[in-house]
Amino acid sequence: MGFMAMMVSWPAIAAAFIVAASLSSPAAMRASAAAAARGGGGNNPTAGFAKVDLTGGDFQVQRPYDVPESRRFRYRDGVWTFWVYDSDKPFNTATHTNPRTEVRLRGHDYSSGVWQFEGYGYVPSGTSGVSVMQIHNEEGAEHATILMLHVYDGVLRFYDGPAIESNIYDRWFRLNVVHDVKASTVAVYIDGKQKFSTNVIPSESYYFKFGVYMQHRDWSNCMESQWTNVTVYTKSY
C-alpha cells in the first residue's frame, strides 16, 4: 500500500515542479504583474500614457569594443541577457569609461512631456557595483545622467545613495521609471508601487539605457542582468 501510494503521488509531485518552474518564467512574471496592476487601479503607473512604437533597430547594443557581441549579449525568446567583466574594455576606443554591455534606446530621445521606461528585470545573486538602468542626458551635457539605478549586494539604489528596493536578487521585477521633463522629477516604481521620487537637474534632451554598466565601488568580477518586455510610454501635458 505504501509503495502504491508513493507511485500515485509522483505525478502530483512532478506537476508541482512544473508549476513552480513556470511561475519563475518571464511570461508568468509579466502576467502576474499585469494582473496586480489591473487590480490596483490607480497603482498602474502606465495609466494615461500612450505606448511608443519600438522596432528592433531602436535597440543599440554597446559592449566592450574588443569582443564579439555574442560574448557579452544574448537575445533569446524575448529576453535580453547582458554580462560584463570588471577587466573588460570600454565600448569604444575614444572613451575611458568603465566596462558595459547595455542597450541604448535610439530614435526616441526626448526634450519635453512625460516619458516612461518599463521593463521586467532580473539580477542574479553575486552581481554588484553595477548600473542596470539609466536616463542619460544628451552627449556633451555637463552631467551625463539624471538617473542611474545601481545594484549593490542585492539592493537597488538611486546611484549609490537611497535604497529603492531590497532583496532584488534572483527574481523578476517590474520596473517603471517616470520622468516629467517640465517638473524636473523622476519616480521609480517596483511591481506597480512607487518606491522613490526626486527632483533632478534639467538638461536639453534625454534617452533611456538598460543592461549592465560597472560602477566605481563594490563591483563583482562578473555583472549580469536580464530584461524582457521593455516598453516606452509618453504623454503630453
Range-by-range predicted roles:
Residues 30, 37-54, 91, 109-121, ...:
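Ligand-recognition surfaces built from glycine- and aromatic
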Residues 189-193:
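Short strand-turn-strand beta-turns centered on an Asx-Gly dipeptide
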Residues 152-176:
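Short, aromatic/His-centered strand-loop micro-motif at the edge of beta-sheets
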Residues 1-8:
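N-terminal secretory signal peptides that target proteins for export/translocation
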Residues 8-33:
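Cleavable N-terminal signal peptides of Sec/SRP-targeted secreted and luminal proteins
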Residues 86, 123, 179-181, 214:
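Short beta-strand segments enriched in hydrophobic/aromatic residues
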Residues 171-180, 186-188:
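Short tryptophan-centered beta-strand motifs in secreted/extracellular beta-sheet-rich domains
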Residues 64-67, 72-154:
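Secretory/extracellular carbohydrate-interaction modules
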